[in-house]
């Protein structure tokens, strides 16, 4: 199982929610990866063209670095699954934090 969680600033990016999400993955027998997806506003234009209300319009886009700053504390705990941010692995099960740098996360 690969669990993918979009993080939206001010909606589900608090420490408690992130910790509970990881704990839920730990309880799943077949969870191989928890992947956090930074919220983006790329669909805004399409919603406007369709005349639809974009309910998250007031929320700012997040970068990988923004997400790492919110969830990086998870890399200090032993988990039975990998952790990634938009496909970039930041934690490897059984090994720990990967060598990903701030520069890479900000790119």
Please provide the spans of the model-predicted regions.
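Short beta-strands and strand-loop turn motifs
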Residues: 1-7
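Auxiliary Fe-S-binding modules of radical SAM enzymes
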Residues: 7-107
């Amino acid at each position: 199982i690969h669990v993918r969680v979009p993080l939206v600033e001010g909606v589900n990016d608090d420490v408690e929610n992130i910790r509970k999400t990881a704990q839920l993955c730990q309880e799943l027998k077949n969870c191989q990866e928890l992947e956090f997806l930074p919220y983006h506003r790329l669909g805004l234009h399409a919603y406007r063209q369709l005349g639809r209300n974009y309910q998250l319009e007031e929320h700012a886009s997040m970068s990988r670095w923004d997400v790492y700053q919110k969830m990086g504390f998870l890399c200090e705990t032993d988990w039975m699954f990998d952790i990634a941010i938009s496909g970039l692995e930041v934690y490897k099960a059984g090994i720990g934090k990967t060598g990903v740098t701030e520069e890479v996360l900000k790119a």
